[in-house]
Amino acid sequence: MTEAFARAKINLTLHVTGQRPDGYHLLDSLVVFADVGDRVRAEPAEALSLAITGPQAANLPVADDNLVLRAARTLGGQGARLTLEKHLPVASGIGGGSADAAAALVALARLWQVPLPDPAAVLKLGADVPVCLEGRAVRMAGVGEILTPLAAPLPEAWLVLANPGVSVPTPPVFKALARRDNPPMPDDLPGWPTVESLAAFLATQRNDLEPPAIALAPEIARTRAALAAQPGCLLARMSGSGATCFGLFAAEEAARAAAEAIGAEHPGWWVAPARMVG
């Protein structure tokens, strides 16, 4: 048996800078990961199969077009018994499906002792799959295929992730964008020796998908506000196309206290404190 961890992907920034003739949007995003996520296990078997377990399993029925199965087929036609232990909410802006696909590629490559697919094949699985396969802090550009490591490591930090239980499909959010030619981040990103300096930089940047997502799901604004109101929260923003929002914290104690407070006030929300992985 082999196993791989599918960490939540967090867009600290997400600038939509253009649109290609084929309809794909051009992005400029500072991406990190949170130390919370799903797990993919792979065991030898004659045929390819998938079972989904975990607290979010009921929200993701097994289907033939599941990204985990699509990733497996990208590696070849061998058999395996796959189990996806689902902890991240579905269609929530933190790359759950893409992270699961990347984890499936890693687990199956080990099980079958085959190389990972070429970058073009990985990108065909989804725009976020390449960055999830990378699994570290990068600047993501193009349609998700241009990944540039950061010049300096990010400071130690904590995140609180909160999702109000609303599923936000990505296409309507992009369709509702007011404009698609927004400015990118600076060409040269500064170093961030402290969490406070990182938060100050992020405050000058954007998630261009946040306004249209809030128009479609006003609960996102309430989620962001709940995070921003917590003691120690340096910045609150939506990740990806929503509806999950993150709060950035310097201290683990403050992050855990914030997650507990939000969870108590909003028992129907999915809330998780997590170390930021850069």
From Swiss-Prot:
Q: What is this protein called?
A: 4-diphosphocytidyl-2-C-methyl-D-erythritol kinase
Name the GO terms of the biological process aspect.
isopentenyl diphosphate biosynthetic process, methylerythritol 4-phosphate pathway; terpenoid biosynthetic process
Record carries keyword Transmembrane: no
- The entry's active site is 9, 128
The biological pathway it contributes to is:
Isoprenoid biosynthesis; isopentenyl diphosphate biosynthesis via DXP pathway; isopentenyl diphosphate from 1-deoxy-D-xylulose 5-phosphate: step 3/6
Q: Which organism is it from?
A: Cereibacter sphaeroides (strain ATCC 17029 / ATH 2.4.9)
> What NCBIfam families does this protein's entry cite?
ispE, PRK14608.1
Q: What is the protein's known function?
A: Catalyzes the phosphorylation of the position 2 hydroxy group of 4-diphosphocytidyl-2C-methyl-D-erythritol.
What GO MF annotations does this protein's record show? 4-(cytidine 5'-diphospho)-2-C-methyl-D-erythritol kinase activity; ATP binding
Gene3D superfamilies, alphabetically?
Answer: 3.30.230.10, GHMP kinase, C-terminal domain (3.30.70.890)
Q: Can you tell me which family this protein belongs to?
A: Belongs to the GHMP kinase family. IspE subfamily.
Pfam families hit by this protein: GHMP_kinases_C, GHMP_kinases_N
On the tree of life, the source organism's domain of life is Bacteria
Per the UniProt entry, the Enzyme Commission number(s) are: 2.7.1.148
The alphabetical list of record keywords is:
ATP-binding, Isoprene biosynthesis, Kinase, Nucleotide-binding, Transferase
